[in-house]
């Protein structure tokens, strides 16, 4: 199923691609066991899995929950992705924050307690260059103990100065591991190259990132197939990038500009089962839960195996402090076009997708304490690298 689609550029000898293309016929023993854990289960079986998952999470991570916030730098993008609000041909309000505006957004997050931030941007080298990204990281490094980036895939040597500036984690989602569906979803732009994206985590590891985050966007393909491929990818990275901490995110599609309708669904029960299956199969891998999910579901899932949560999120550049409103525009074939409204004071850039859990970070922290979990705003000190 995964092999019958375009390959893109040449595959490196150490690529995950050959392993992926052997699915579903060839699976490791670990992944076969994982596949059994995501098969339809009775209530009693699922409760037993949940109990096991909770115990393993407590054993490996303690009674803690890392909290982070995404900081969107730009919603410019040269890719056309059918499901994404930032897709190039969507007539949305766009902006790329200037450095002082990025700092203002970051200081707002720091004032709320965050010391872990994820810098996010659409893929557009004209607006989000490696130099711009390094400058943003360097400007925030003093106030944030952990800076992660989620941007378009880059070459190893392009990541090196970003790491040197202070970034310690790279996040890149394959979106879907089904090559055919991937080709259908990504109609133009460099993101069409499946293998280039697939091997991005390894390039980041070779550049010096100490944390690597991957994931699939559930709703593009059958969730069980995505989960098996994701498990194979986790197992591969645990061996190939053995000095890095590996984490996995399990986002489900949310409404966004363009009004894409997912062809596949994943129920709350199935999401809970997947979290438990991942925790039992990979006890030391981090599991991330975003504000895509509604508050009541996030509250129910925090004790199952999740180790990291976003809180109080905005998915539009400048969303926390209304930065960049004076520079809002449309982008048409690389050209900046003025919007039709007068001024930008009452407008914000368009977000990537709709948020479901809009509770304030302090409210999330109090909820966690009520569940016997300690919210962790900071769990890493860059100075340790120099000691």
Positions of predicted regions on the chain:
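Conserved, mostly hydrophobic/aromatic
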Residues: 53, 81, 119, 172, ...
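Short, small-residue-enriched loops and turns at beta-alpha junctions
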Residues: 75, 123-128, 218-223, 256-257, ...
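Core AdoMet radical
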Residues: 88-105, 109-205, 210-220, 242-249
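Auxiliary Fe-S-binding modules of radical SAM enzymes
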Residues: 1-44, 239-387
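Generic structural signal for well-ordered alpha-helices
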Residues: 69, 106, 133-137, 159, ...
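Catalytic cores of alpha/beta
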Residues: 155-164, 210, 221-236, 294-304
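Short, charged low-complexity linear segments at domain edges
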Residues: 45-66
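Canonical Radical SAM [4Fe-4S] cluster-binding loop centered on the CxxxCxxC motif
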Residues: 59-101
């Amino acid at each position: 199923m995964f092999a019958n689609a375009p390959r893109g550029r040449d595959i490196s000898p150490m690529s995950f691609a050959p392993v992926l293309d052997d699915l579903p016929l060839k699976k490791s023993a670990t992944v076969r066991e994982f596949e059994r854990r995501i098969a339809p289960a009775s209530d009693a079986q699922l409760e037993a899995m949940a109990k096991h998952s909770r115990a393993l999470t407590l054993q490996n991570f303690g009674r803690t929950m890392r909290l982070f916030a995404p900081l969107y730098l730009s919603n410019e993008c040269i890719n056309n992705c059918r499901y994404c609000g930032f897709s190039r041909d969507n007539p949305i309000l766009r902006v790329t924050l200037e450095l002082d505006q990025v700092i203002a957004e970051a200081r707002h997050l720091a004032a709320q307690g965050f010391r872990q931030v994820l810098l996010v941007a659409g893929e557009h080298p004209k607006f989000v260059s490696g130099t711009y990204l390094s400058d943003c990281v360097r400007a925030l490094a003093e106030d944030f103990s952990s800076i992660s980036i989620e941007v378009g895939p880059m070459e190893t040597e392009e990541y090196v100065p970003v790491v040197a500036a202070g970034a310690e984690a790279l996040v890149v989602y394959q979106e879907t591991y089904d090559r055919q569906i991937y080709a259908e979803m990504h109609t133009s732009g460099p993101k069409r190259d499946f293998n280039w994206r697939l091997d991005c985590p390894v390039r980041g590891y070779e550049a010096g990132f100490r944390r690597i985050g991957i994931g699939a966007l559930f709703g593009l393909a059958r969730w069980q197939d995505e989960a098996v491929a994701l498990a194979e990818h986790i197992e591969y990275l645990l061996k190939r990038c053995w000095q890095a901490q590996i984490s996995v995110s399990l986002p489900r599609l949310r409404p966004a500009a363009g009004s894409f309708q997912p062809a596949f669904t994943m129920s709350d029960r199935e999401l809970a089962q997947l979290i438990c299956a991942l925790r039992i199969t990979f006890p030391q891998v981090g599991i991330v839960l975003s504000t895509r999910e509604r508050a009541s579901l996030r509250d129910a899932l925090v004790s199952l195996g999740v180790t990291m949560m976003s809180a109080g999120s905005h998915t539009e550049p400048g969303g926390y402090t209304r930065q960049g409103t004076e520079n809002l525009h449309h982008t048409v074939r690389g050209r900046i076009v003025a919007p039709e409204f007068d001024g930008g004071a009452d407008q914000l850039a368009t977000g990537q997708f709709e948020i479901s859990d809009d509770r304030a970070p302090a409210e999330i922290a109090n909820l966690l304490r009520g569940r016997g979990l300690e919210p962790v705003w900071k769990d890493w000190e860059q100075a340790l690298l120099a000691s």
